[in-house]
Amino acid sequence: MPKYDMRDKIRRMSIIVYMLQKKEYNIHQIRDKMNYIMDKEWSKSIIEKDIAQLRDDFDCPIERVGNKLRIIEPYSFVNQIQQWVEFYI
């Protein structure tokens, strides 16, 4: 199994936030678009872990709408990362 670095994680999370701010997607659609955009094969479980971390650590308002996910209120991933870094500095 390849080792994933923080840059890939931040890229994946950025893509997830961007996609879910635009429209609703299910986890399989997110994974397919992620794999296409990043030209890598990410598993469903990796994407689910990223979504959980966005919710838990970065206070991302991801909500389930039927069988799809969506960010339903304004959200800035960059601001959340800055706050997270400032907390540890």
Provide a role label for each language-model segment.
Residues 1-88:
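Short, basic/aromatic recognition patches that contact phosphate-bearing ligands
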